[in-house]
């Protein structure tokens, strides 16, 4: 299965600290681990999971072996990095963060009275990056329109990313 993975700039996982062998023209080495979501296993993302986990660098990863599809990720017993998604760079990451911040502002101000409690946290949260700002926009949508609005906002974010990154 082809999926995606966010890593730090040096190829380490932000949660485990595992340093991946980065591909150099051909796929990286296979990494194996027991499947135990959030504890062990090779965690990958489907396209719709990207806004939830948006990190520093984005990689295409091949998952194989035992697999468990979770709500916001896929966990497999084997995986290897295929290539970096070069379009996801610091400028693109900042653009996505800004888009999410602008969307959060628009949503917070779309109702009367405006949701000033949300409006006050958007700009200070920008340094935290795109995962937090995409969450804020989705939560504001949910506060206004319920769970369906949350999911619609997440789908909107996914569409924005997919279109600009050329992902399917």
Predicted ranges, named:
Residues 1-168:
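Short, glycine-biased loop/turn motifs at secondary-structure junctions and
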